[in-house]
Structures are given as C-alpha cells and as structure tokens.
Amino acid sequence: MLSSVCVWSFSGRQGTRKQHSQPAPTPQPPESSPPPLLPPPQQQCAQPGTAASPAGAPLSCGPGGRRAEPCSGLPAVAMGRHGGGGGDSGKIVINVGGVRHETYRSTLRTLPGTRLAGLTEPEAAARFDYDPGTDEFFFDRHPGVFAYVLNYYRTGKLHCPADVCGPLFEEELGFWGIDETDVEACCWMTYRQHRDAEEALDSFEAPDSSGNANANAGGAHDAGLDDEAGAGGGGLDGAGGELKRLCFQDAGGGAGGPAGGPGGAGGTWWRRWQPRVWALFEDPYSSRAARYVAFASLFFILISITTFCLETHEGFIHISNKTVTQASPIPGAPPENITNVEVETEPFLTYVEGVCVVWFTFEFLMRVTFCPDKVEFLKSSLNIIDCVAILPFYLEVGLSGLSSKAAKDVLGFLRVVRFVRILRIFKLTRHFVGLRVLGHTLRASTNEFLLLIIFLALGVLIFATMIYYAERIGADPDDILGSNHTYFKNIPIGFWWAVVTMTTLGYGDMYPKTWSGMLVGALCALAGVLTIAMPVPVIVNNFGMYYSLAMAKQKLPKKKNKHIPRPPQPGSPNYCKPDPPPPPPPHPHHGSGGISPPPPITPPSMGVTVAGAYPPGPHTHPGLLRGGAGGLGIMGLPPLPAPGEPCPLAQEEVIETNRAGNDLGVLEEGDPRPNGDPAAAALAHEDCPAIDQPAMSPEDKSPITPGSRGRYSRDRACFLVTDYAPSPDGSIRKATGAPPLPPHAGVSQAPPASCPTSTPTQQPGYPPSGRAPSPPQATPEAPAIFDVWLPPFHRSHQPPGKHQRGGRHPGVSPSPQQRACVGEPPSASHPQSLTLCISVPSSCHRLRPRETLGFPLSLPPRLATGNGGRECPRDPGLPFPSRHSSPAV
C-alpha cells in the first residue's frame, strides 16, 4: 500500500525559488529506504514514459507558488552531497530565513524527536523543504533565534537572546520542538520578563474591545460611538472588563431580559438596548454619550467628597441648645426641662448631599438593571462601596423624625458610618488609567510589601529592645524605672520610636538622652533607610511597567476588524500558479504501454472539488459521493480553485472568518444556501455517522508545557492525498492486506520517472447519468489519488478575553466544518475503510509541531498520532503507525 501526503504550511517560503530541471538524484538502496513517501515539492513527474501524471492533476502549492505534481508510489528522494551520506560525519546545510547554517548530522541527533533531528532521517527530503540544487533545507523562520537553537544542539545549553521578544522566542522554540524549561537559569529572567509584560498587558482592556463588541451587538453607533475612543475602563478588581465581555456575549447569544424571553418582542428589545445602556454607565470610552455620563459621575463624586469634608469645618457648623420637656421618673413630680446641645451643619450642604445621593442611586439602579451578570456585579468591590455609601443617607432621613432612644442610637451609628462616603474616591478608577495602574501595582507587589513589613518588624523589635537597655546605662541607681532621665520606660513604648526612626519621620516626641541611646538611634536610622530602600525600587518598577503598558495599549491604533479577508497575492506562498497539464500519453492499446488517466471531475454543487478522482462503483455508499459526481464530498468546506485561479483563503483568513462567526454552512445538493450549523446538519443527516469525537478529549492529560501552548494554532493542512486503490468491482476502497505493488517502471527498480495511475473497471450501467465516463481499462494494483480540502484545526473554544497562557490548555478539537459526512460501509462484503492523512499541529511534548494523523472516516474518527503515540494518549481501538511510515488501518 502506498500513501502520500501533500501539506501546505502557512509558514512557507516567501518569494519564488529557482526551479531546477536537473535529473532527479538516485534513490536510496532498498535495504535502507523507508516506506514510500511523497517526494519533495521540487520533484516533478517526467512527461514521457510508460505512465504519466493524470490529467487534472491535484493542485498543490510548491516552493515559489509553483504546482507540485502529486507523485504517488515513489521512493524517497536521496539528498545531495551533504545529506545523502547518512553517517554521523556527514554535513547538512540549513537555510533559515536566508541565512545558511552548516553543521554535522551527529549534532542534530543530540536531541531526538525535535524538528532538526528529523532532518537526519532518510525521508527528510520528502518531509521538509529540500532543494537538491543547493543541497539545503529551507525554513522560513527567524534566523537570529535559530542561531541560539543550533548552539543548543552543539553545547547543550539554551540561552535566550536579549534583543528578541519573549513570546517570539517561545514560538520559535515550539516550532523547533524544544521545551522552554531547557532555558538556562542565567537567561530565565530575561525570557520570563517578556511573558510577565504580556500578561500585564492583557490585564488592561484593549482600546477597541468595547467598541467592537458594541458594534457586534448591533447598532452601536446609534448610541454615539466615537471612533477615536481611548482605552476601555475597568474596575479596580478587574470585574468591569469581565462584565463587559459577559454583556456582549449575552447580547450576541440572544439572552432574554426582564421584558420578555429571547424569542419575543421584549427579548428583542432587551438584546438591543441592554449592551448599549450597560456600556453607557460602565465604559466611559465606549461612546460620546458615555463620556458625558462619566463626566457627570465624576462631578458628583467630587461634590460629594467636598461636602463631606466641609461638614466638619467650624464655619459650616451651628451649635444650638434645645430644651426638651421630659416626664420626671419620680411619680407625682412635675416634668423636667432638659437642655440638649446639638450640632447641626448648614442646610444647603444637606441638600447638596441629597442631590448627589439621588444621582448615585439612579446610576446604581441602572447598572444593576442592565448588568449581564448580577452575581458578578455584586462581587465587585466598587459596587459594594456604592451601595454602602448610599444606604446611610436614606436611613438617616427616615429616622430623623423619630425621638425614641433607639432611633437616636441608630442615627449616631449612621453618622459614624458616613465616613464610607469617602470611599467613593475609588470610583475614579473608572476614569483614570493611573489609578487602575496603582491597583494593579499593589496586587503585583504583594510579595514585596510583605517582605518590607517583615524587615520593619524585625528592626522594630531589635532596636526597641536595644534602646531600652541602652538608656539604662549611667542611670541613677535610685531611679529604678528610669522615668526621671529617659522616655523609654518599657520596650513596647520603644516600638513607636523605632517605627518613627526607621521610616525617617522623626516626630521628636521621644528621643534618647544618653550617649549609648544616641548610638542605638543612629544605627536604627541607618538600618531603616537600607530596609526601605531594598523593596521600594521593585514596587516602583512594577508601577512604571504597568503604566507604560497601559499607555501603550491606550495608544494602539483603532482596529474595527482584526483582519480583512483578501485573496492571496501573486508571489505569496498561498498563491498557486499551476502549470499547464501535460499532454495525455498514448492509449495503452496503441503500443505505448501507458495508462490513460481519467479526466478531472468537477462536481457542480458541492463544497469540495476532487481533482483526478475516479467515478464510483456500484457499491460506493451514497454518503461518500454526496453533493456531486465522482468526488469525495465533505460537506460545508471551501472548494478548491480551478486551474489558473488563486488558492482558497489563506490560513489566517480562514481563521478570522471562523472567529467572526461566518462559518461555512452545509450545502445540500443543488442548494447554494447555507443549511444552518454544519455540525448539526452533518450529524442529523441520515448518511452521516455520528462523528462527534474530539481530536483530544479534555480529560486526556498530554504532557504539554507552558511553552508549547497555543503554538501553531494557525497551521493547517491544505491538501490531502489518500491511498485508495479501486477494487476490481469498481468501488474505491482500501486494499487492506493486498500484496505489494508489482515492479512498475520507475517505481522500485528504476529512478522515479513516472506517476502511475489507475482507473476503476467499467461496470454495466456505469457511470450514472451526467457523470464523466471512466476509461475502459483498469489497473487495480496502482493507487488512486484524491485531493481534498480540509479546514484548519482549531483549539477548543475559550471565553473571549481570557488569556490562553498560564496552564489552561484545553486540547485540540475539530471545528464544526471538520465533522464531515464521508459515509459508512454499505455492507460487510464491501467495507470502505477510508484513511486520510492530514498534517495538523501536535500538542505533545517534544514532538514535531506538525505530525501525521490518521482518520478512519468510515467510523466516528479519533486521531492517532503519526509518532507511535509515544507521548500522546493512546486509543486502544486504533493502531499507531510508526513515525516514518504511512498510517495503516
């Protein structure tokens, strides 16, 4: 059995490489040759020969945008003068980003399982971008980082460059298959500080997050959006940003509101206005109207704090004597007149405070009503402060007319609690970035504050004890307590003096009088300066880092759309310039001995185009060919381009399209309209098996390191080649257990000079109406080649705004478009054990970032890694192919 895999990686080489027309090098001897694999992209199938490439050859992207012929059944191409040796003394040339590096093969073998170690394997020329003309492997990666990676192979020590950003270095390490924990201790802080900065940057909301979310919620500009808004505001404890995200998720998901359910008119009104009103009072940078509301709130906060301070000034206080007649406690005695002294503030201050409380009450009620998550809202410390600062005023107004003793006690308590009003100052954090930075700095510097407190506590205890005994030296023997000549009568009193001295305040209320006490005081002052000077710079640096990051994020350019899909441009690795198809060889009955390839079949109404496919036999399951004639139909997938047209959307465009919610729908035959959720429609179709098994379940614990999380999520497999052989009855299925291929010319006994093809047998009443006829002769031993487009693999969904670092790796899960209907075996006598090989990002520790995975699509698929499952979760129901062989069923 033969299989070959054509892969289109986004990190392909930029520009056009020189095409070499030199003859193909001689393959490796049979005893050292690996299983047949696809030759490198530069390997072209010979035009003349006994068998030639099929017409309508599958479109694949080779170096420089040239089309690579999908030669199947050819042995691995031998490398040139450096790569073909196979011994440890042979040299190998690696071109990384235009910079050539030369090293020994034995050096690359020092770290087995990595990408560079794979260059020393016999089939490396087929698996990587190998140029036989220059005898070098090309990688379009960062050349500066690669120098450190290569030195790691040479010296065994991994150092981090100081001029490279940490996330970039981490991504490069993941591409080369190196664990970040191998970084040397001397460079760990340099490597870590970039990640700390990245995490700190994520703690501040992006300046366009609220604007985009409002726009996505629908009609945000009606609320007065300003395109020049700055950074979004958030609460002191970060709850504001989370509530914004919850609000926009709720609006986008169609959550119902108090006026009605999601499906009714009330729900529609709620979904439209809830995010707008919430942003109006919560995010001052979301719209121009929100700015006016923020200015009003800031004005009332300042007025309330000013009123609170003026109430204690003598100029605004009136002292009055009120006489109250009270019954005498003695029976029969006349009533007593009691004069009470009352302190009253100016009445206009009370009125001003009442107006401020009315505004705060209105603001609080609006935020509670339109909050997307009431529980999260009540957990916020700022919201608790708002509620506590409002309640005393209403209680005081309600109890002011009562004259009972209990009411007076409550009023006295409420007057004491009125100091909570001063906490409204923290509401300014919604309007000033510096105050939010201060809050982040205090939380980030908790360890430094604890260290400072411990140092001060130790110094206070030591110097308070020393000053007590130092002042006893030279004291009068008759003064036992020392109260006549010193202030330090006991050690606890010395605590206050030690704190004042170590913090260099020096109130002067206590000071030593003896020479020994003065010496202790000098030592205490010096120790205090050194103690405070050590952790303070760390705190200051944290504040500076947070503030600079906040300013940088606030000044980021406004991005309404993260990415605008556009077709690939000529010269990019995602643009195909297909060569004209070669002329068909002579008919085998005319003496050439070749095999006529079938014409390409283009299904009229399906989402997948199959180039060079063969018409199905009578036993082919209808689900296999659903949606078009003669093609391997996978529903809801983008079509392959016609010759001369650019390739489908580039990988980042596909990802951004999926993120925007523009997922491709399932297309029924003859129906160009999307049919709803691709996954639901595919699973509900009668021809589809229940393909709902994720690629890696969350409970499978893969040894993923922090450095390997989230890398290569933008990689994808562009083309996919199966190794189906048509059976004699005309159906296309895997020839499991079939004998090896006969010695074809140019396959095993001679250098590769042809591309063998095969056709199914002509059956009575075949092909069906409207399908292209098949050639009359069949060669069941030769493999049939199918090119199928698959969408990229995506990581499991996480809530928006969540940082994907820090140990939260959800695993890999197929997107809805990958839950494709392929078909079940129609009967036990005609099994269709389809096997597709696709290159996807690997999430395993110290494995190549792109591994070959097997899909037995006749059953609910589970992924089997192409590395033997050495460090990945095993599935007992599927065999694991060896690393250097094609997957087997």
UniProtKB/Swiss-Prot annotation:
Catalytic activity reported: K(+)(in) = K(+)(out)
Motif Selectivity filter: chain residues: 504-509
Residues that, per the record, bind Zn(2+): H159, C165, C186, C187
Gene Ontology CC terms: axolemma; axon terminus; calyx of Held; cell cortex; cytoskeleton; dendrite; dendrite membrane; dendritic spine membrane
PTM section of the record: N-glycosylated.
Compositional bias (Basic residues): 794-808
Keyword vocabulary terms for this entry: Cell membrane, Cell projection, Cytoplasm, Cytoskeleton, Glycoprotein, Ion channel, Ion transport, Membrane, Metal-binding, Methylation, Phosphoprotein, Postsynaptic cell membrane, Potassium, Potassium channel, Potassium transport, Synapse, Transmembrane, Transmembrane helix, Transport, Voltage-gated channel, Zinc
Gene Ontology biological process terms, A to Z: action potential; corpus callosum development; cortical actin cytoskeleton organization; optic nerve development; potassium ion transmembrane transport; potassium ion transport; protein homooligomerization; protein tetramerization
Main subcellular location of this protein, as a coarse class: membrane
GO terms for MF: delayed rectifier potassium channel activity; metal ion binding; voltage-gated potassium channel activity
Comp. bias intervals (Pro residues): 24-42
Glycosylation sites: N321
Lipid bilayer topology: Multi-pass membrane protein
SUPFAM superfamilies per UniProt: POZ domain, Voltage-gated potassium channels
Binding site for K(+): T504, L505, G506, Y507
Phosphoserine modifications at: S697, S702
Residue positions where Phosphothreonine is found in the record: T759
Tissues and organs where the protein is expressed, per its UniProt entry: Detected on Purkinje cells in the cerebellum molecular layer (at protein level).
Compartment list: Cell membrane; Presynaptic cell membrane; Perikaryon; Cell projection, Axon
UniProt domain comment: The segment S4 is probably the voltage-sensor and is characterized by a series of positively charged amino acids at every third position.
Function: Voltage-gated potassium channel that plays an important role in the rapid repolarization of fast-firing brain neurons. The channel opens in response to the voltage difference across the membrane, forming a potassium-selective channel through which potassium ions pass in accordance with their electrochemical gradient. The channel displays rapid activation and inactivation kinetics. It plays a role in the regulation of the frequency, shape and duration of action potentials in Purkinje cells.
Protein's recorded name: Voltage-gated potassium channel KCNC3
